[in-house]
């Protein structure tokens, strides 16, 4: 048997599969326990396979933890070392990829030319002297050199010096990507360094849970492009798990609806909602690399658009902006009070009909984990006092302000939340679903009390308030889906993010237009994945003319997709030269051989592509490869491009081959 697990920001889902019969035996779902992932994984394994030991041969995992860490910027402090770059470069181009000039960046002397030759030798003793002090302010490091994909000498030498100075994670750009754009490689290395401890904690939790149950299966992880990799490979390159969860959800949608050929897939999670396109039964891939929030990576992933909207998104009401969505995930009030009876009693006694309570009385903060001695000493007096106060019981924002005498200034709660010390709890769509009876997992009475409070402040009744929130969700998902289809149209791609398109979408979603009605239609079906899909996807479909599908077991679609992937590796080798000699090289520019005849060059290129793809395939944990090598002829352009042809090698195997 095999198990597929998806650990999301809010829920952890699982499926138990009979490998021989290719049959789903059982599904399970449990809240993700961020303070200790072993708890939710243990619960899930107990639900799926109550007996210890057993014949679990394979465990495949997908997770949104890396993606959510990027979206919510819950990182450790990473020092970025750049060779061949300047502060002006970062000011001019860094923002476009998510890197801004900051004290966290060190511009090292030394550099390479575009052929990979050393054009400026660094003063390594001086570099080491700088690093002795500079490295003390960081938890991890990323090292990237311009043209470093052609020559790794600068990155690897710097890594060795840092390694001798400190025992902290160090990642080089050359270890992750051969992308020409060094800033995109810098983003990859920067994120990989920060995600390493997050992913290591996740994997350790999984293996400990399995070991306690006497289970020792083969483990693999879903990559952002929908293929899978071994546990060892994933630990080295956790950045490749970015969009792992969304990729698995699309694979799950395809598996649950085998007849589906063309679709817009919306995965509604707890933290984000993701939209992707399935065309001719295959998932569209973004070859330029995954973009997560402001970060443009060079990691290939599914072509996806993400909105910070999920079941655990905060609903904010204020006089300036009215009802709108908060930033990041919060703990639904209906779920939080289940753990804290005192807060449940507080809501039960709250008189929302006659009391003049500020909105801050319904926003709570709970202690998530205590800071260590070093981190605790770095907190200011108010932050330390907040930690001490929350040890006893969660406190409302209003109570904290009264306690510390800060009527309007920041209490440092944002810092405490970002670093995982406290957890915010507020009204969310999950609470609204409790009130309407569409989803019951927590305390409905608390959700109802909170809704009455918010509705009163908005000048409406509770039922109208809930209906308004549902429409806000449906409209945002509708706009996300239509924009995804617009970006897929080559003639419209350039204007997809324009203000005019936004106004057009706002107009089409309007239900009180007097003179004109606009309704988009498409041959692509609308498919929903995720626990709330059955609630919201039909509402989204009402806004435009498409068929709507929510497959059975949509609530565990990610876990289904996790167990159905394949290991896939690719390698491309180029031949350059419109006449002899012919140069054979990797796409990154690394030279392989110079040949006097085109026939010899093609033989060398084919062999090199096969060798390269198998090397990467086995690194990812593949077995029994099926290898294909394809030649693509290109017409060389004199004086502009000497590219003659490209040999593309592919090696693949099914995930189930790993246990055969």
Label each PLM-derived region with a short phrase:
Residues 1-660:
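N-terminally biased helix-coil "hinge/interface" segments that flank
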């Amino acid at each position: 048997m095999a198990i597929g697990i998806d650990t999301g920001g809010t829920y952890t889902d699982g499926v138990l599969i009979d490998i021989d019969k290719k049959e789903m035996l059982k599904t399970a779902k449990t809240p993700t326990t961020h303070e200790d992932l072993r708890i939710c994984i243990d619960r899930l394994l107990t639900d799926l396979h109550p007996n210890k030991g057993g014949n679990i041969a394979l465990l495949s995992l997908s997770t949104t933890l890396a993606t959510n860490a990027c979206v919510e910027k819950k990182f450790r402090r990473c020092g970025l070392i750049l060779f061949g770059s300047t502060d002006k470069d970062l000011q001019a181009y860094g923002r476009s990829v998510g890197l801004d000039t900051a004290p966290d960046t060190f511009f090292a002397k030394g550099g390479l030319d575009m052929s990979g030759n050393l054009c400026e030798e660094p003063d390594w003793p001086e570099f080491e002297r700088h690093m002795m002090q500079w490295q003390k302010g960081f938890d991890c490091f990323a090292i990237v050199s311009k043209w470093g994909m052609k020559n790794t000498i600068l990155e690897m030498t710097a890594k060795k010096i840092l390694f001798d100075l400190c025992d902290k994670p160090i990642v080089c750009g050359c270890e992750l990507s051969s992308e020409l754009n060094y800033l995109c490689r810098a983003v990859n290395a920067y994120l990989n360094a920060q995600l390493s401890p997050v992913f290591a904690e996740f994997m350790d939790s999984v293996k400990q849970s399995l070991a306690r149950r006497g289970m020792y299966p083969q483990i693999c992880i879903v990559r952002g492009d929908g293929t899978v990799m071994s546990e060892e490979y994933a630990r080295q390159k956790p950045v490749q798990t970015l969009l792992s969860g969304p990729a698995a959800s699309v694979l799950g949608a395809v598996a649950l609806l085998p007849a589906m050929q063309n679709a817009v897939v919306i995965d509604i999670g707890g933290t984000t909602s993701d939209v992707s396109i399935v065309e001719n039964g295959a998932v569209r891939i973004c070859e330029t690399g995954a973009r997560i929030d402001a970060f443009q990576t060079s990691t290939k992933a599914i072509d996806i658009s993400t909105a910070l909207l999920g079941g655990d998104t905060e609903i904010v009401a204020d006089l300036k902006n009215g009802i709108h969505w908060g930033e990041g995930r919060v703990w639904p009030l209906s779920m939080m009070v289940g753990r804290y009876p005192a807060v449940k009693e507080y809501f039960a006694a709250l008189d929302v009909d006659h009391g003049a309570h500020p909105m801050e009385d319904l926003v709570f903060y709970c202690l998530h984990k205590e800071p260590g001695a070093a981190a605790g000493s770095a907190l200011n007096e108010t932050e330390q006092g907040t930690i001490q106060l929350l040890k006893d019981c969660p406190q409302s924002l209003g109570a904290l302000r009264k306690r510390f005498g800060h009527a309007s200034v920041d209490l440092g709660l944002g810092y405490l939340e970002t670093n995982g010390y406290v957890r915010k709890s507020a009204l969310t769509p999950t609470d609204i679903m409790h009130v309407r009876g569409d989803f019951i997992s927590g305390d409905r009475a608390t959700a109802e009390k909170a809704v009455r409070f918010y509705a009163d402040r908005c000048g409406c009744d509770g039922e109208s308030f809930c209906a308004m929130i549902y429409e806000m969700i449906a409209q945002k998902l509708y706009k996300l889906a239509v924009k995804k289809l617009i970006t897929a149209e080559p003639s419209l791609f350039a204007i997809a993010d324009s203000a005019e398109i936004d106004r057009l979408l706002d107009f089409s979603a309007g239900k009180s237009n007097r003179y004109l009605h606009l309704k988009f239609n498409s041959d692509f079906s609308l498919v929903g994945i995720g626990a709330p899909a059955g609630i919201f996807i039909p509402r989204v479909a009402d806004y435009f003319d498409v068929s709507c599908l929510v497959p059975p077991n949509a609530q565990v679609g990610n876990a289904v997709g996790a167990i159905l992937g394949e290991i896939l590796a690719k390698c491309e080798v180029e031949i350059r030269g419109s006449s002899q000699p012919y140069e054979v090289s990797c796409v990154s520019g690394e030279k392989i051989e110079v040949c006097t005849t085109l026939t010899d060059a093609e033989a060398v290129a084919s062999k090199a592509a096969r060798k390269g793809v198998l090397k990467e395939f086995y690194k990812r944990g593949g077995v029994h490869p099926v290898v294909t090598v394809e030649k693509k002829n290109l017409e060389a352009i004199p004086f502009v491009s000497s590219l003659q042809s490209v040999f593309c090698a592919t090696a693949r195997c099914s995930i189930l081959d790993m246990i055969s």
